[in-house]
């Protein structure tokens, strides 16, 4: 379980950012929630240092597993629990019974002790006891197997809340190796173990039953007993009846019939003698003779399951015409009542002696033969009268050839072959021979047909079957006494039979040889009263077919009294199965003939031979004989030694087992197997029931047929096995059998294993199709090679070939057996085996033709949040809608993630890897720590989902804020992020307007500056710094984290501060910073994302301190800090990665900048959403949602380019902290401002972005900070440091570049950032700030998807005027805005907003106007963006055509707040943002001049999406 959970957890972590890890996410669903409880700092740190996605996933899964409930045992479904309990008890009982069977069989006196079978019985019983705990555990508890745990594929989160739910591999490849995959996707564990236990219980029973039959403890007919006899009527038993009819036969038969009936009645009375005789008859019947008369042994037919006594006539499944040459009627005394006389057409011409001999032989043959036919010496065959009222069947009379033996042989063989023919006219003779079809089964109650052969006018009838040869001998002697003259014949017959049995033991070749010698022996047989009728013919025919050969070999007139001898003879010569024993019968007859011909052994000899035969053929003894044997063998109490003796003492067993239990179908073991296969065939296909009932039904149908194949295969194989074991003792002529007992059993077990494995092939097909559908509908996933889709087809082909090879020999033996005995279960076994193969081929042909299946799939949110088990493993996707403001991303995960991936041309891969590392690291760490306060779970998830930030432009590790003409690293990053978000590709054009590839900082850099707060080191520094600082530090990490925290946790404790001036804002920032650990976490993520992106993408992340013509780069994040802490703000944070600088600066700048910065991402949405100073909570919530969304996008972008940094930064600020510093940098990028929501970015706005932009950046400090931001760019740098969470952000450099051309401040000071929830178009990137036409063009490219409307309002704002540090000619901004299609302006705005207001501050007046109405509410560029957005309708043209009005969407598409006044008024708001194609998320009317482009740019495009959505909400 633990391993499974780990695997799924690993999948979840890696799938945290990916929609592909449905199982992982599902496993992580609760785990993620619980993980938020973990110390976020630890999580962040651990996530940072986890370099491998798999390792991070494992770590996350371990955390989740620990937090899931602390319990590794999860109960299965109720019905499964009861199934486990009941079947465990039942199988425990069967195992105990197996031990009892072992002891009971050990006490039986065996002629040939089955040591191997007994040992196997006790060993397998022990194995069952070992497997029972496994079965119970897997049935009652969840073990990570989909089918066993009752998990339905492609279901919602509610189905998959259990953390132990394995990874289903639908959304993404499952973790783990082949063994884990087999464990997860294999058949139901409990049912599989159940099947194994059932086979372990069933096989020993079969082995012992075969040995018992071999030893004669059970009648040979038991060979044909099956587990399905309670359902299927044995056809052979019906065949005799159908053939038998009233036989008006010669007077001879009637008297002899009377005598026979008398004898039979005596036998029926089951006197001791009669029993013995019956046993003898039974043995004779078991001889290989084709014709099994119903002589004394009654059970001559192997097919007849009934004991000889009880089913004398039934035994002949196939009735063979027996030829009787005896014409004397009075010799057929026996069988009058029970046997019908059939004219012996074959023997009519034979002399009475010959006839008598033939009759005796026939009787022996009859005993041996399937038919219980008594043949009168007169030439009539006496058929056992099953009903006794049934008329005797009249057989056409035909003259028998002079050679009764050869003719009789032929006739018998022919009759056996004919199985349905009553008579055969062999010669024209008055004597009649009765031919009964071997197909007929006699059901007469008499065990043996007693026929009287009167050679001298005396007729004797023997109707006894002897269990033991000795007993048989006795009975024979008595019979001989009764018979008088017939004794002689009987002796010969017995002798012959005895001789024959040895030959029986011989192989068919021996039998044939014997048959060949028959003619010579036949003569002797005639003398010995065995007619030569069968000798020659039988050798020929016997091989092919029937017990007739036996009758032919010794067409022993079945004398009622001599029957005993006859039976004994037959016992020696009769084959167990007439059907198989055709050849054997011939052999027997030849043997008997030879012996009888050569020497007419005395009865004693015959008895001895018979005894030998019986010993050789123990199975021949009917059940009744077995009883006598049983007492003999078990009379003495045997004390066992060793382990058996210990068990004997334990169970107190001192008596041998009653072998009768083996003949009572069905056995409990067989029922247990039925139950196991039923559960298997239903529960395995059930995994597809919710998603595709049609496929589940097809799957189940195939499995039901497979189960039938296993069940009926066992029935057929059991018959084969018993027959082969018996043949070892009593050689049976087996014309078609090519296997021995061991190989037969081994092949059956192998075929069973293949059939069970075949179900996995069908499952593989269905799972592959479903996984393809699940992944195809997720834009995030790339459709790659589908070559494996045909793997299932190849596997099915291999299965068919393997199963055909294994089953071919078995089917051959089954068909050969059925051909001889017409055994219905044998036929069904072969038929179902072939049908299964054909059905498999047909099903797979259909599956190959059917290209598409209709699968019912859950909603994407449900899939990712529920199936993934993490309720949206991606914070952006899930947080804004589900938990934090970034849930907009969560809900829009598919669309947003899709857009991001589609636009960024990065599928889940980046989100998975980045989100897994950053999301898991930051989400789990930051989410745990930061979100611990505000909703750690949401953030934790958000952190994972941050990967889906549209801003997947981490390709540029540098975050640049460039003004219109200037292409800066920050711009590259931002552009990359924006373009990824917008176009699905990263544009590294430095001239491009604002690149807020990094979530907050980078984007916030906007056109002017990008705080490079999110390099790996910077992120780590931020995280560390934020942790040092306290709540905000912990969650966000240094300065960036503070801003991002505020973004994530928009409402700092003092909501008024947001409305208030810088001090209030600073306080809020501090509070927000403190909140950062908790609520700001989401914003921290956003900022962090920005920072990370910035670090990865922009030079500004490096804290470049240089001013380009059109861009200003602040070496320290302090430059971008909101001016509120003047001291803090002025000190430009060194271009250190966020790690170093942010920590120092956060204290001073943190309070202010944290509030501002944190609010910047949140502030704008906050203002848009909540104009009240309560924006902290609402902003936190709303901004968290939107912020999270953009942050996630940014994180994705950031993570992709600089995965390590992102991981580190993300863990701290939940992917936002890195961005936060960046956000500080850019005012121009309102989107950056919004995304970063970093007040520092607002200060950076000093460098060129209106203060208002800064104000929106910071929630509380927005107004004051705007004013401060209005302060010289130095403040902006200071703000960069502190506003960007200098402590965190110092690592993040803010490059404030005018980007006059590329990012003219599309948002001139937007002092009145209208409180429009959508007002802050953080998506709007102030790409117009980029001075470089190239940047502009790239920005335009980014905004290609966006409607030109953003570029339409090209509000030229002299960013330079607003940001002294980032002076940028208005013309440049306009140019860039125009050149970039106003995409840069919007991009800058977004980046600025994302950056957290790091854009150059707007003029104080602008700031105050903007900040007062909006910054108070929004306290950051998001407000400005919102206003701009308000002015300009949000672009609905996202890369995926989705409109981002829902905060749940992560669309990081640069929300160009449509030419809303960009911080650079000359460019116009739209110009600043139009570059972001993804901006359509929502175009918030932006106040062209009300908010500075710095605010816009400060909101990263990603953040913009979040903030805008938040504002919209």
Curated annotation (Swiss-Prot):
InterPro entries: Ommatidial_diff-associated. Expression varies in tissues throughout development. At stage 5, expressed in the embryo dorsal region followed by expression in a striped pattern at stage 6. During gastrulation, expressed in ventral region and ventral nerve cord. Also detected in many neurons in the externa sensilla and chordotonal organ. At stage 16, expressed on the surface of the midgut. Additionally, expressed in a subset of cardioblasts (Tin+ subpopulation) during dorsal vessel formation. In third-instar larval tissues, expressed in the eye and antennal disks. Residues 247-266, 354-373, 383-532, 879-913, 1045-1090, 1115-1155, 1173-1214, 1231-1335 are annotated as: Disordered. It is found in: Membrane. It comes from the Eukaryota. Residues 1122-1149, 1303-1314 have a biased composition (Pro residues). It is a multi-pass membrane protein. The chain crosses the membrane at residues 78-98, 121-141, 182-202, 669-689, 697-717, 737-757, 788-808, 827-847. This is Protein tincar. The lineage of its organism: Eukaryota, Metazoa, Ecdysozoa, Arthropoda, Hexapoda.
């Amino acid at each position: 379980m633990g391993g499974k959970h780990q695997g799924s957890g690993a999948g979840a972590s890696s799938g945290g950012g990916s929609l592909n890890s449905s199982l992982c996410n599902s496993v992580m669903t609760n785990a993620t929630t619980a993980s938020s409880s973990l110390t976020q700092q630890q999580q962040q740190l651990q996530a940072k240092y986890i370099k491998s996605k798999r390792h991070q996933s494992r770590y996350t899964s371990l955390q989740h597993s620990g937090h899931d409930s602390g319990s590794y045992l999860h109960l299965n479904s109720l019905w499964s629990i009861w199934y486990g309990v009941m079947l465990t008890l039942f199988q425990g009982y069967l195992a105990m019974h197996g031990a009892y069977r072992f002891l009971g069989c050990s006490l039986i006196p065996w002629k040939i002790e089955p040591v191997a079978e007994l040992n196997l019985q006790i060993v397998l019983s022990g194995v069952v006891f070992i497997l029972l705990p496994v079965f119970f555990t897997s049935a009652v508890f969840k073990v990570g197997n989909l089918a066993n745990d009752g998990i339905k594929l492609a279901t919602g989160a509610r189905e998959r809340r259990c953390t132990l739910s394995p990874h289903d591999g639908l959304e993404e490849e499952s973790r783990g190796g082949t063994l884990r995959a087999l464990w997860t996707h294999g058949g139901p564990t409990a049912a599989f173990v159940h099947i194994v236990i059932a086979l372990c219980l069933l096989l020993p029973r079969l082995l012992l039953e075969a040995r018992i039959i071999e030893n004669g403890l059970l009648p040979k007919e038991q060979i044909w007993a099956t587990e399905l006899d309670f359902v299927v009527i044995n056809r052979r038993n019906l065949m005799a009846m159908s053939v038998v009819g009233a036989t008006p036969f010669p007077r001879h038969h009637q008297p002899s019939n009377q005598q026979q009936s008398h004898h039979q009645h005596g036998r029926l009375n089951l006197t001791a003698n009669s029993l013995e005789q019956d046993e003898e008859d039974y043995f004779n019947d078991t001889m290989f003779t084709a014709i099994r008369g119903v002589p004394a042994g009654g059970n001559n037919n192997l097919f007849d399951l009934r004991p000889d006594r009880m089913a004398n006539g039934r035994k002949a499944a196939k009735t063979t015409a027996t030829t009787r040459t005896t014409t004397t009627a009075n010799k057929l005394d026996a069988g009058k009542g029970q046997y019908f006389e059939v004219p012996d057409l074959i023997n009519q011409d034979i002399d009475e002696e010959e006839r008598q001999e033939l009759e005796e032989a026939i009787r022996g043959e009859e005993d041996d033969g399937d038919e219980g036919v008594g043949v009168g010496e007169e030439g009539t065959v006496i058929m056992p009268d099953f009903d006794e009222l049934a008329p005797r069947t009249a057989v056409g009379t035909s003259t028998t050839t002079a050679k009764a033996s050869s003719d009789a042989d032929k006739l018998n063989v022919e009759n056996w072959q004919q199985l349905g023919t009553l008579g055969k006219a062999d010669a024209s003779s008055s004597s009649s021979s009765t031919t009964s079809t071997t197909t007929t089964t006699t059901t007469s109650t008499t065990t043996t047909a007693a026929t009287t052969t009167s050679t001298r006018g005396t007729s004797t009838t023997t109707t006894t079957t002897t269990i033991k040869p000795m007993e048989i001998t006795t009975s024979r002697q008595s019979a001989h006494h009764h018979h008088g003259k017939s004794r002689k014949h009987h002796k010969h017959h017995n002798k012959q039979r005895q001789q024959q049995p040895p030959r029986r033991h011989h192989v068919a070749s021996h039998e044939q040889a014997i048959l060949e010698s028959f003619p010579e022996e036949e003569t002797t047989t005639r003398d010995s009263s065995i007619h030569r009728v069968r000798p020659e013919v039988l050798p020929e025919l016997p091989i092919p077919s029937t017990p007739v050969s036996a009758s032919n070999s010794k067409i022993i007139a079945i004398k009622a009294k001599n029957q005993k001898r006859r039976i004994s003879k037959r016992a020696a010569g009769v084959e167990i199965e007439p059907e198989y024993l055709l050849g054997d019968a011939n052999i027997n007859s030849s043997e008997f003939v030879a012996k009888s011909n050569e020497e007419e052994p005395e009865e004693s000899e015959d008895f001895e031979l018979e005894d030998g035969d019986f010993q050789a053929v123990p199975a021949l003894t009917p059940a009744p004989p077995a009883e006598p044997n049983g007492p003999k063998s078990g009379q003495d109490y045997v004390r066992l030694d060793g382990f058996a003796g210990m068990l004997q003492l334990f169970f107190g067993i001192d008596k041998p087992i009653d072998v009768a239990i083996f003949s009572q179908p069905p056995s409990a073991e067989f029922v247990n197997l039925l139950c196991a296969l039923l559960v298997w065939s239903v529960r395995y296909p059930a995994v597809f029931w919710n998603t595709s009932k049609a496929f589940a039904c097809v799957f189940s149908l195939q499995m039901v047929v497979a189960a039938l194949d296993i069940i009926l295969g066992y029935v057929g194989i059991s018959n084969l096995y018993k027959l082969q074991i018996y043949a070892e003792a009593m050689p049976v002529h087996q014309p078609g059998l090519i296997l021995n007992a061991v190989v037969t059993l081994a092949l059956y077990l192998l075929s069973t294993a293949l059939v069970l494995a075949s179900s996995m092939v069908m499952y593989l097909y269905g799972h592959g199709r479903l996984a393809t559908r699940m992944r195809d509908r997720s834009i995030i996933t790339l459709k790659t090679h589908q070559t494996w889709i045909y793997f299932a087809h190849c596997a099915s082909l291999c299965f068919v070939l393997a199963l055909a090879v294994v089953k071919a020999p078995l089917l051959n033996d089954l068909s050969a057996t059925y051909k001889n005995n017409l055994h219905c279960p044998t036929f069904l076994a072969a038929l179902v085996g072939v049908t299964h193969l054909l059905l498999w081929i047909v099903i797979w042909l259909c599956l190959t033709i059917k290209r598409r299946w209709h699968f019912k799939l859950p909603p994407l949110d449900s899939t990712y949040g529920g199936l993934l088990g993490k309720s949206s493993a991606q914070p952006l996707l899930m947080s804004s809608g589900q938990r934090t403001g970034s849930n907009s991303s969560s809900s829009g995960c598919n669309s947003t993630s899709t857009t991001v991936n589609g636009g960024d041309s990065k599928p889940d891969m980046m989100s998975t890897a980045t989100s897994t590392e950053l999301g898991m690291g930051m989400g789990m760490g930051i989410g745990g720590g930061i979100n611990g306060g505000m909703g750690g779970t949401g953030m934790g998830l958000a952190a994972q989902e941050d990967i889906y930030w549209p801003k997947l432009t981490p390709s540029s590790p540098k975050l640049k804020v460039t003004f219109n003409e200037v292409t800066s690293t920050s711009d590259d990053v931002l552009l990359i992020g924006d373009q990824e978000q917008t176009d699905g590709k990263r544009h590294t054009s430095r001239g491009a307007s604002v690149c807020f590839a990094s979530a907050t900082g980078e984007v916030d850099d906007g056109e002017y500056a990008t705080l490079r707060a999110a390099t790996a080191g910077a992120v780590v520094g931020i995280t560390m710094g934020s942790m040092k600082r306290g709540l905000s530090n912990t969650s966000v990490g240094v300065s960036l984290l503070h801003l991002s925290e505020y973004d994530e946790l928009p409402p700092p404790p003092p909501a008024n501060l947001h409305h208030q001036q810088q001090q209030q804002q600073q306080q809020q920032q501090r509070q927000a910073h403190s909140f950062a650990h908790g609520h700001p976490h989401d914003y921290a993520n956003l900022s962090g994302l920005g920072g990370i992106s910035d670090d990865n993408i922009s030079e500004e992340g490096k804290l470049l301190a240089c001013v380009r013509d059109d861009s200003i780069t602040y070496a320290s994040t302090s430059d971008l800090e909101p001016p509120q802490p003047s001291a803090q703000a002025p000190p430009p944070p060194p271009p250190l990665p966020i790690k170093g600088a942010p920590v120092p600066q956060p204290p001073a700048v943190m309070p202010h900048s944290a509030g501002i910065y944190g609010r910047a991402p949140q502030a704008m949405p906050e203002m848009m959403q909540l104009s009240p100073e309560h924006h902290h909570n609402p902003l936190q919530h709303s901004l968290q949602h939107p912020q999270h969304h953009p942050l996630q996008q940014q994180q994705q972008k950031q993570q992709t380019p600089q995965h390590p940094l992102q991981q580190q930064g993300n863990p701290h600020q939940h992917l936002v902290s890195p961005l936060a510093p960046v956000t500080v940098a850019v005012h121009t990028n309102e989107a950056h401002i919004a995304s970063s929501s970093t007040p520092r970015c607002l200060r950076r706005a000093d460098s060129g972005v209106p203060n208002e932009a800064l104000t929106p950046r910071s929630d509380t400090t927005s107004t004051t900070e705007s004013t401060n931001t209005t302060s010289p760019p130095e403040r902006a740098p200071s703000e960069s440091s502190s506003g960007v969470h200098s402590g965190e952000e110092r690592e993040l450099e803010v490059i404030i570049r005018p980007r006059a051309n590329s990012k003219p401040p599309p948002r001139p000071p937007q002092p009145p950032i209208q409180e429009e929830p959508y007002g802050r178009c953080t998506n709007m990137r102030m790409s117009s700030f980029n001075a470089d036409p190239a940047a502009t063009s790239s920005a335009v490219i980014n905004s290609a998807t966006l409607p030109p409307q953003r570029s339409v309002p090209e509000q030229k704002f002299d960013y330079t005027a607003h940001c002294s540090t980032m002076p940028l000619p208005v013309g440049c901004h306009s140019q860039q805005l125009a050149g970039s299609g106003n995409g840069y302006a919007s991009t800058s705005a977004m980046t600025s907003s994302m950056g957290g207001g790091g854009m150059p501050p707007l003029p104080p007046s602008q700031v105050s106007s903007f900040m007062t109405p909006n910054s108070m509410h929004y306290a950051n560029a998001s407000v400005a963006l919102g206003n701009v957005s308000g002015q300009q309708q949000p672009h609905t043209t996202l890369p995926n055509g989705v409109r981002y009005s829902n905060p749940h969407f992560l669309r990081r598409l640069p929300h160009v707040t449509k030419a809303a006044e960009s911080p650079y008024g000359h460019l116009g708001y739209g110009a600043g943002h139009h570059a972001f194609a993804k901006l359509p998320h929502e175009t918030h009317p932006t106040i062209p001049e009300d908010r500075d482009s710095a605010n816009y740019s400060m909101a990263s495009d990603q953040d913009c999406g979040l903030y805008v959505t938040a504002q919209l909400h």
